[in-house]
Amino acid sequence: MLAAARLRISYPAGSDEDGNSWEALDEMRPLSALTADPADLVRLLDWGPGKGMEFSERARPAQEVIAAAPIRAVHATAQLREVMTQFWHDHFNVASGKDESTAAFFPAYDAMLRGHAFGNFRTMLGDVARSPAMLYYLNNADSAASPA
């Protein structure tokens, strides 16, 4: 069902503040971020000098998760799992559009919630609290205890 799904990505040619440029794009792509290794998606965060990338490319992983939700809801054989996954997304909300850091980790966050849909709540809560998507969303990615 998801293997045949495509999502449009479209943006004009442009450049960033460092002068890195990109060509205009308008194409239909498969939902490849859903099964991508999170380490591969981290490259979307490395967009410094010499690595110009349009924002739509960095936001793409989260957009794919959002696009996949209704497809799974309609076509999944385990529809109750989809309902519970959406419930946990609503309960442990991570605004995927907050920034590109959250977006890059959103497919892994979705997979984690999906895996815990009917599991142990305490285990899921621990995984949510340590999730890179949640840490970026809460601005806790670089948080550390004071040496007091």
Give the residues covered by each predicted segment.
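A contiguous strand-loop segment
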Residues: 1-148
